Amino acid sequence: MMMMMMKKMQHQRQQQEDHANEANYARGTRPPISGEGPTSQPNSSKQTVLSWQAAIDAARQAKAAQTMSTSAPPPVGSLSQRKRQQYAKSKKQGNSSNSRPARALFCLSLNNPIRRACISIVEWKPFDIFILLAIFANCVALAIYIPFPEDDSNSTNHNLEKVEYAFLIIFTVETFLKIIAYGLLLHPNAYVRNGWNLLDFVIVIVGLFSVILEQLTKETEGGNHSSGKSGGFDVKALRAFRVLRPLRLVSGVPSLQVVLNSIIKAMVPLLHIALLVLFVIIIYAIIGLELFIGKMHKTCFFADSDIVAEEDPAPCAFSGNGRQCAVNGTECRSGWVGPNGGITNFDNFAFAMLTVFQCITMEGWTDVLYWMNDAMGFELPWVYFVSLVIFGSFFVLNLVLGVLSGEFSKEREKAKARGDFQKLRENEQLEEDLKGYLDWITQAEDIDPENEEEGGEEGKRNTSMPTSETESVNTENVSGEGETQGSCGSLCQAISKSKLSRRWRRWNRFNRRRCRAAVKSVTFYWLVIVLVFLNTLTISSEHYNQPDWLTQIQDIANKVLLALFTCEMLVKMYSLGLQAYFVSLFNRFDCFVVCGGITETILVELELMSPLGVSVFRCVRLLRIFKVTRHWTSLSNLVASLLNSMKSIASLLLLLFLFIIIFSLLGMQLFGGKFNFDETQTKRSTFDNFPQALLTVFQILTGEDWNAVMYDGIMAYGGPSSSGMIVCIYFIILFICGNYILLNVFLAIAVDNLADAESLNTAQKEEAEEKERKKIARKESLENKKNNKPEVNQIANSDNKVTIDDYQEETEDKDPYPPCDVPVGEEEEEEEEEPEVPAGPRPRRISELNMKEKIVPIPEGSAFFILSKTNPIRVGCHKLINHHIFTNLILVFIMLSSAALAAEDPIRSHSFRNTILGYFDYAFTAIFTVEILLKMTTFGAFLHKGAFCRNYFNLLDMLVVGVSLVSFGIQSSAISVVKILRVLRVLRPLRAINRAKGLKHVVQCVFVAIRTIGNIMIVTTLLQFMFACIGVQLFKGKFYRCTDEAKSNPEECRGLFILYKDGDVDSPVVRERIWQNSDFNFDNVLSAMMALFTVSTFEGWPALLYKAIDSNGENAGPVYNHRVEISIFFIIYIIIVAFFMMNIFVGFVIVTFQEQGEKEYKNCELDKNQRQCVEYALKARPLRRYIPKNPYQYKFWYVVNSSPFEYMMFVLIMLNTLCLAMQHYEQSKMFNDAMDILNMVFTGVFTVEMVLKVIAFKPKGYFSDAWNTFDSLIVIGSIIDVALSEADPTESESLPLPTATPGNSEESNRISITFFRLFRVMRLVKLLSRGEGIRTLLWTFIKSFQALPYVALLIAMLFFIYAVIGMQMFGKVAMRDNNQINRNNNFQTFPQAVLLLFRCATGEAWQEIMLACLPGKLCDPDSDYNPGEEYTCGSNFAIVYFISFYMLCAFLIINLFVAVIMDNFDYLTRDWSILGPHHLDEFKRIWSEYDPEAKGRIKHLDVVTLLRRIQPPLGFGKLCPHRVACKRLVAMNMPLNSDGTVMFNATLFALVRTALKIKTEGNLEQANEELRAVIKKIWKKTSMKLLDQVVPPAGGQCGLCFLSPSRSRS
């Protein structure tokens, strides 16, 4: 009994400790080990309790045990038993033999009976389970609670309050037991020292505290009610703490901890980024304050009254280009609250920050932009908002993703390594045990020899059986026949010996073999695929209002197919045997689907169940489509990697679920029953009960319209003017944690696993190639044996060679990214030793690109059968084409013709402008035609190699020019054809691709990416399709509704009805009743797929979800909250497709781009980091430090360079920022004056700073630093600003102007003044030069911008092409205020079209714009339509246009950004002990102190002190002793000049080389030669002088010269 108790205690203790270790490990602290008893190692002070340490200890113990066991061999069993116990013990106890403190709470020793009881209870397994169940039950209780408006309640809630006490008691008891068992605080493994325990502790204490408070307030309430209310609110706030209890579940699930740990670890780099984001927000908020303060409060009022003139008011402007009040008798004046109930504005710093944050999240930013356009005119606002979205969203927020994916893969590798080690240990253990058993068995065999013979016979009989090519035979033989023989009695044996049964067995065996061969054949596979395809067809042909015959056919087909699938299953079972059949996951799944189908059919036939319920089962059959993957390796690898990531995703989903639950419960506490402030409309996204709260939180998590929910929350607490603004914190935290952190972990997991899948693919390819090679070799050797004639042999070999070469030549054309050492065989036209622009998103700086192309020779063969290679005409053409002026001219013409396309007027096609542009068009077309003819004359048309038409890019040119020519030919005959051809002219800019090399590489890279993405496209489309089919089953015909909500079927929905505007009985409006379908519906598979696509882009999905929830019957109106459970369909779809598949899509693009970038350096022996560091070391130049000789100047210089001066300026900038942020709308005159004076003071101070610096550094030295130039610009701008505001006193009072409308001059003059006021804000940017981490971030930012020019060009081209097509197709749609195509958002001019596309790229309600461009829309009154054709504008092409644009943008283009960023910012998560380019700046800075003149050399004696000042990994650090530093320096082999100096680049290069171990092993001279070759290969332009400096050639001087001086010094 005692033994069992001990064991149990050990087990529980191990568990507790594991948790403690895990948590401590997560926080990065290592619990020290208390006195470890006799087993502890002498160096226990240094030991770290990581789980592998425990394992190593165990290994040592096992070794010791082994040595014992060898000395005493006989009792093997007992020994292995003891060993196993020992191992288990050591494993359980971690490292410390007694983790519990000797005393708990200063009084209870380990032998104290109370404490022993506590320990045994706490470490008892059922106790753990009980607590987990209690937590779970508590969550359920919290969820059942229904919040009511005005703090009402019902009996359930009262009962729940009582249950709450029970939970509180349970948790309190648990806490006290644990505290007694482990001690409270002072010991290493004490209770509160574990993070999870601390959380428990706080929750319990707060719970107790709230109960006590409640009792106290109840007692005081007896006296008077008013005092109790406030106490009640406090309790409510404390009650909200209970919602954290679900977090305790985390400590029970280890895989959750990996995800959580990686998120927690990522917090440090994330903080850097958070600072950067905050910085961007602050700068933009202050600029917004300066530009837009008080602009949102003017709107159109009726003259002489305070009644707003419009239904949905918008800001307006007195004059200028803003919105004018159109209705007569209305005027523009201030006095309106502002949009969104006055929440969205720039009236003071807090509101401005909230508005800017909302714009960065890309929800509702266009609304703010449009309001600003209305208030100020459209010249200025777009610059502000578009730059904010590009910087804030695309760049800075994508950094979050980079950091998370880096951390996640690191954390996963750690966990994996830990797991592998554990497995290794266990295997060793097993082997030892096995050895023990083998000893036993050999002994036993010696005793019992008779059995052996029988076994032999049995074996013989088995081997005679022929085995098939598959392993399953053997398993099945054993399982099938072995069992029957074993189970039969003597009777069975008698029967089995008879002839008949033997025949039957033989026949059975033969049949099964035949069946198996059939099942495994490719024909059978294709048959099944055809059946699956037919099955898919029947299911997808279902739609709303289908004719009866179709329904019958579908029923019959379903039954027939079901029968066939059942047959297939049975045949497989028979041929493979049950055991082998169920090994494959696919077969299990198949079986499940078939059984489901059979049950469904039976239930429907017996009319036990409506067909709808189970028809979803039918759709699950569609999963069979994935059978295709069996013979398609890359696809099956992809599916495999998806299934692999399911594990990590499951734990992430659990975490996500916990997160959603906690925030839903919190939301119910805060907003339950509060969203009833507007009686006229029912809000759908509320927190009134648990399911609804879950949906709302999930909606905020996807980021769709989260700002609308936030506005409701603020209004519920009294609107923007009250303290209600505080609640926005809840929404912001929820949005940041959920959308940015948790959802990006999805992406991180995706990227991580995809990289694995890719490596799997390549490995398989290599294996296949290897097999192929062996096959060929075998064939050859056979042939050689056949005919032993040596001549034949030689011929065969040489023949082989030729074919291989030919093959290579052919393939060279196809492979756009050859490795480093193979010349590009892209096309005869550009032959080059190496692509100068690396493929992938990191092209080198344009300055480095060698844009000179080698001139391509005239190809062999005659052009047009008449012009030979030497024909003078042809030679002349060749010269002309290759002349640089000609190529540049053509580029210019391409640009001009593109500009002409953009300048066309889409509405009035016969306007003067269009006529002029038409003439230009003729000219451009003529020029391009001549160019093509010249090229064809030179290269020939297409019959021979290298001809003009053999290059895809040339074909593109031909197409574009041909289209233009054709459209001139048929000017009037068929209008629509011409229209299409005119649209095709848009492809002109694409011709530039062929002219700019860098662009060409990016484009090729995109194509490669698209090729590789193919597989994922297939999987995603299949999933889309499946969900669409299920959606059709669930919702077909159910999304109809009447415009009058009182009527619920088409028969009643006729005539007119009266609507009261805003619930006001005095303002009735008459409307017509119309029975209409939803724009997005599930009536057939295609519309279902479109609806689901919009859901997967997260745009407008809540509206669709609530339509689905309200859906009632086919062709019947909605019923409020009719089936809430339907929302599960949408949530599963969003999680599988939108979160997971779309992220994998994105991840795939990123992985592909990174691989393409690396491909170029495939054979260059240096990895990316080494390349970057070496490049830096080769290109860096020493910094000049100016130290003045003049003593007075030196004093100035000394002051300016001192730290106190720096800090003073820092503080001043902060104060200046504070002053700027204090401005607000309607500020008093006094405040205004104070602000102006402060502004002058600051301007004065910064001017003084500039003057001091100019004196100290002299103008030349001052302006050589970029930051100083920036400073001086700001100072000059500020001075102009002060001067202007003094000269024009009206400006300084930023009170709104009187309602009189001053002239336009006033307006423009004001804009110029506000422009100069921006200089005040720009001082903030100076802060960036101060922080170290931020500086590195900025440096990387600039670096990634250099990688972006071609990507940006590609994006610009995409936008250009789509904008021009949009103008041609949708330019005539009329602008209406209540429509998506309106004054702010339309295709009527080129800039407007580009802005609209930019809006779609950020995903702002793109699907609504698409609907507004469909056919049947009203035409613009100015456009040329015939009478009766008012409603003919728009086109069905809109669907293709918008969906293709959205996909290109969201998945390809924006991911180019992400790929570039993740590439450049990997240093944020990399191990800081590995040298990276960001460490090398420090070397330059410190070198300049020893070499102020930037001569590039210092005395060798200074090198040691220099390196001891630089921190590792680059230098030695201050802690490195002098002698060690000297020794390490000698080992570096740094070249030393004859005058005893060392060179800058040589020193830096040697440091990089030793830190990254680049070619440091082996023979030194040989390594140097190899390294020289690599450098020459990658950096062709490195001068030989520099190369000899950094890597001395063989026989040159070497770093051993360091020996003598260092000896003399030491």
From Swiss-Prot:
Ranges of compositional bias, category Low complexity: 53-66
Expressed in which tissues: Expressed in brain, heart and skeletal muscle.
Basic residues bias spans: 81-92
Sequence ranges of the II repeats: 508-754
Segments of this protein annotated with the region Phenylalkylamine binding: 1430-1473
First and last residues of every III repeat: 871-1153
Key words of the record: Calcium, Calcium channel, Calcium transport, Disulfide bond, Glycoprotein, Ion channel, Ion transport, Membrane, Metal-binding, Phosphoprotein, Repeat, Transmembrane, Transmembrane helix, Transport, Voltage-gated channel
Region (Binding to the beta subunit), start-end ranges: 428-445
Region named Dihydropyridine binding: 1073-1163, 1418-1484
Gene Ontology MF, one: metal ion binding
Segments in the Extracellular topological domain: 145-162, 214-234, 293-380, 543-557, 604-613, 673-726, 904-919, 971-976, 1036-1125, 1223-1237, 1287-1311, 1371-1437
Coiled-coil ranges per UniProt: none
Acidic residues bias: start-end ranges: 824-836
Stretch list, region Disordered: 1-99, 448-487, 765-846
Superkingdom in the source lineage: Eukaryota
Gene Ontology process terms (BP): calcium ion import across plasma membrane; positive regulation of adenylate cyclase activity
Keyword Transmembrane helix in record: yes
Cytoplasmic topological domain: 1-125, 183-194, 254-272, 406-522, 577-584, 633-651, 752-884, 940-951, 997-1015, 1147-1203, 1258-1264, 1332-1350, 1463-1610
Transmembrane segments: 126-144, 163-182, 195-213, 235-253, 273-292, 381-405, 523-542, 558-576, 585-603, 614-632, 652-672, 727-751, 885-903, 920-939, 952-970, 977-996, 1016-1035, 1126-1146, 1204-1222, 1238-1257, 1265-1286, 1312-1331, 1351-1370, 1438-1462
InterPro entries: GPHH_dom (IPR031649), Ion_trans_dom (IPR005821), LVDCC_a1dsu (IPR005452), VDCC_a1su_IQ (IPR014873), VDCC_alpha-1_subunit (IPR050599), VDCC_L_a1su (IPR005446), VDCCAlpha1 (IPR002077), Volt_channel_dom_sf (IPR027359)
GO cellular component: voltage-gated calcium channel complex
Function noted in UniProt: Voltage-sensitive calcium channels (VSCC) mediate the entry of calcium ions into excitable cells and are also involved in a variety of calcium-dependent processes, including muscle contraction, hormone or neurotransmitter release, gene expression, cell motility, cell division and cell death. The isoform alpha-1D gives rise to L-type calcium currents. Long-lasting (L-type) calcium channels belong to the 'high-voltage activated' (HVA) group. They are blocked by dihydropyridines (DHP), phenylalkylamines, and by benzothiazepines.
SUBUNIT field: Voltage-dependent calcium channels are multisubunit complexes, consisting of alpha-1, alpha-2, beta and delta subunits in a 1:1:1:1 ratio. The channel activity is directed by the pore-forming and voltage-sensitive alpha-1 subunit. In many cases, this subunit is sufficient to generate voltage-sensitive calcium channel activity. The auxiliary subunits beta and alpha-2/delta linked by a disulfide bridge regulate the channel activity. Interacts with RIMBP2. Interacts with CABP1 and CABP4, resulting in a near elimination of calcium-dependent inactivation of the channel.
Protein's name in the database: Voltage-dependent L-type calcium channel subunit alpha-1D
